[in-house]
């Protein structure tokens, strides 16, 4: 704990954590106007979506992703929009965009980079948690590279090591 505190101290004043329970993307935009961040993490991005006025939930999620992208462009910041995978991804190591929860194409269309994280299927009788993870880069407008990186999750430090 003391090492973490020492490492955090120099950046503490530049990191803001906001409770966004019940908030929408308009609130996110107002926070960006007020604080002018370089990086915004939306965990879970889908929870900021307003479903009113949309015929289907996937349309609301697409509109939400579009709003997040516009915030990134207008406020010159990187927006990390966390989302969940659907049940289609359960037990699979190789993942693709169609396995996104709720919006199979709408959210993906707005992303510059998509990294989907998989873990090994459960093994019957295995008591120990499997820490192997598979980072699937399924969309990459930044460098063009697509593929998988197999790594270990160090849960004590929340780091992936390859």
Predicted region positions:
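Alpha-helix capping and helix-coil boundary motifs
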Residues: 1, 24, 53-59, 126
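Phosphate-binding/switch region of NTP-binding enzymes
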Residues: 64-162
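Cytosolic-facing regulatory segments adjacent to core modules
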Residues: 1-36, 50, 148-150
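Active-site-proximal loop/turn and secondary-structure-junction residues that shape catalytic pockets
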Residues: 21, 46, 85-87
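Flexible beta-alpha connector loops of hexameric P-loop NTPases
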Residues: 16-18, 49-62, 91-98
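Helical hairpin unit composed of two closely spaced alpha helices linked by a short loop
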Residues: 38-78
């Amino acid at each position: 704990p003391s090492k973490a505190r020492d490492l955090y101290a120099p950046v503490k004043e530049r990191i803001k954590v906001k409770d966004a329970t019940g908030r929408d993307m308009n609130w996110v935009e107002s926070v960006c106007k007020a604080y002018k961040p370089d990086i915004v993490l939306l965990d879970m991005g889908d929870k900021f979506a307003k479903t009113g006025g949309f015929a289907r939930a996937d349309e609301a999620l697409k509109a939400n992703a579009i709003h997040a992208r516009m915030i990134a462009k207008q406020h010159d910041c990187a927006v990390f929009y966390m989302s969940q995978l659907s049940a289609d991804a359960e037990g699979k190591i190789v993942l693709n965009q169609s396995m996104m929860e709720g919006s199979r194409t709408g959210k993906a269309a707005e992303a510059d980079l998509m990294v989907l994280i998989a873990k090994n299927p459960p093994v019957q009788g295995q008591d120990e948690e499997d820490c192997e993870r598979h980072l699937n880069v399924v969309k990459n407008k930044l460098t063009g590279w697509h593929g998988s990186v197999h790594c270990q999750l160090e849960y004590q430090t929340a780091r992936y090591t390859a």
